[in-house]
Amino acid sequence: MISYSDTILSSPQRGVFAGSAALLACLLAACGGPSTDAPSSSPSSSESTALVIPMEGLEKTELTFGFIKLTDMAPLAIAYEKGFFEDEGLYVTLEPQANWKVLLDRVIDGELSGAHMLAGQPLAATIGYGTKAHIVTPFSMDLNGNGITVSNEVWEKMRPNIPSMEDGRPMHPISASALKPVVEEYAADGKPFNMGMVFPVSTHNYELRYWLASGGIHPGFYSPDDVSGQIQADALLSVTPPPQMPATLEAGTIYGYCVGEPWNQQAVFKGIGVPVITDYEIWKDNPEKVFGITAEFAEENPVTTKAVTRALIRAAMWLDENDNANRAEAVEILARSEYVGADADVIANSMTGTFEYERGDKREVPDFNVFFRYNATYPYYSDAVWYLSQMRRWGQISDSKDDAWYDATAREVYRPDIYLEAAQSLVDDGLADAADFPWETDGYKPVTSDFIDGVSYDGRQPNAYLESLTIGLKTSQTVAAGEVIE
């Protein structure tokens, strides 16, 4: 049950007052009245002389958005706190949700207008894996932001298998090959090696699987008649809601997990576990969350959808501008109970350009959370195809699909057309710099091998990519009765 105190209400009145203040400042300057001497700069999300006038024809102005208590919900919190929703004439209510399934179901049922979603959720829903519904995304919320944590006991067993730097600290990135002997030891003792991830179609599931497989540990297959994801598995992965990860680890129910922040850093602060790798080290600048809405909502409310996307773009710009200068304020906002509700020091440990592995081993990781730079907010088709490829790799997509299917599905869900229309309007209004957006892209990023195993990924050739991966289903394979069939 979500209490009223956990719900954040937004009113356009603040935006009206802000707009009035901006207008007054402009009039004073034009009339030779008081002004402040300040260096000129390119338009930014948080400081602009442009007067924001809500778009005409908003189909809906009262909206409710859902989120899970993770730091990467930040664009929603900032769009609210900085009045960017209000600038668009939108009354927004933000509501934390109990888990990812509840969040998705409430978007589908129309109880939520949209939500902070796992990147795989709109894709899985659209192809009918789990609840069937056509969900689209006009906005990618962030890059990176996750980590994999193991218990202290497991870490002590892994540590001899990890090379050290001259100062004695472990060398990163840490391969899952260091974990493999530990998993084998547990198996020999008759103990299943249980690990947690947040949802079957979560980034965390696919990142954890990718890391394990790259180190020779089989994370298991799915099949139409067995959705546990544990067929032929060396490590048994199961769902645990993000805020419950540390407690579940401490209880010994799981030996490790993959989750977003602040729940890896929480394990460090509590002294119950050690984050061994970040997803930045698994796949550099990987897409993480998206903002999801139903296709019906986007079709029936195009002006409102554009206005929401504008507000979220401005929030992302604010989060990354001036070399993350606003992150300390963002941490203070996110620490509030109505948002993430974790200790500010815990959130700051990853949100402000550092990441702590073992207690005291804090390292510079400036791109652990990226919200705008590197075109983080653009919904790339190639990102969608990667998630679909992982669904196929592990059997969630049970049958072979040709490359054209992957492309068509990506285009059905990812909506860069909406994103670019919103971005262009911000540029036209003097609120954004045209150079910050990828106008000429076809939606596919260049081929990259920035993965922990060095395997190259070309979003235009998903089947060739699947064939190149050592562990996982190949193009012609399927899973039935617990066996891989050619």
Segments (PLM) and residue ranges:
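C-terminal motif of bacterial Sec signal peptides marking the signal peptidase cleavage site
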Residues: 27-30
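Bacterial signal peptide processing site
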Residues: 32-35
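Short glycine- and hydrophobic/aromatic-rich loop-to-beta-strand nucleating segment
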Residues: 148-149, 290-293, 297-298
